[in-house]
Amino acid sequence: MSRSALVGNITAMLEDAGFTVSDRCAIRPKSFDIAARRGDDVLLLKVLANIDAFDGYTGTEMRRLGEYLDATPLVIGLRTRDEELKPGVVYFRHGVPVFSPDTAMDLFIEEVPPLIYAAPGGLYVNIDGDLLSDIRSQEDMSLGKLANELGVSRRTVSKYEDGMSASVEVAAELEEIFDRKLASPVEVLSGAEEVRDDVDEPEAPEADPDDAEIVTVLTRVGFEVHPTMQAPFKAVSEDEKRERKVLTGHSEFNRTAEKRARIMSSVGHVTRTRSVYVVDSTKRDSVDGTALIEREEFERIHDSDELENLIRERAEG
């Protein structure tokens, strides 16, 4: 299956699950393919046949965009170089949760979250430590007896009760011993932070020198500018109170700029974010809801309210 067809299938599945899905980011470079929202859950999704193609640079950008846009970065893929992705298992690449289309369907359509995650050494399950401790006490089973039945140390059982994950085999054995479900789901929509290894966060990228004047204006009127390197927009800008966020683009106005502006509108609709594209000159006010502002006019803006009003007038005009 081509990657384009795979993206189409994932888009259709998300729409069936009640998500609003953006247009595909059909430009390069791109850190994500589509954005999607259902209620308060916002996703930035990268779709790959081979997840080994997902590099650290892209992972870093997706995590940053997730932070800026209050979204969860996810990768949906089919396989690694060596094997197919197992259903019901969450993998990780560069701090981003990864899983198969089957797992995505279980999660988003059936609302059955995955229970297993991959980590160095094998497959693991999150054990509900408090529940395990309560059941063991109710059954009047000592740490030592349970440890003997599992073939582990008393210290290891104590760690399970303190929240340490267990191998799939041990988790299954625990549930068989007590005849109770003890596994906790992997909270994928929260970034699976409870099981994800910490990753180093490189310094944020510098703005493109060509965008220096745009950054200067945004900073002057009270916005913090977060440059991007692999997105259809040049930056995510937010005011000091983090109440207003704006997807920001800049270039001469040509067919590529128009395409980027359309994608920005679509992504902004999903993330509930305004979008503005600064151009050298144009006779148009907007592209599908992305405001167009000429550079000279943009440089005359004095405060954030003026910018917000101008973006709204252009976008709605």
Curated annotation (Swiss-Prot):
InterPro entries: Arc_TR_HTH, Cro/C1-type_HTH, Lambda_DNA-bd_dom_sf. The keyword Transcription regulation applies. The keyword Transcription applies. One of its GO terms (molecular function) is DNA-binding transcription factor activity. SUPFAM superfamilies: lambda repressor-like DNA-binding domains. Residues 132-189 form the HTH cro/C1-type domain. Signal peptide: none annotated. Keywords: DNA-binding, Transcription, Transcription regulation. Residues 143-162 bind DNA. Pfam families: HTH_3. This is Putative HTH-type transcriptional regulatory protein NP_1320A.
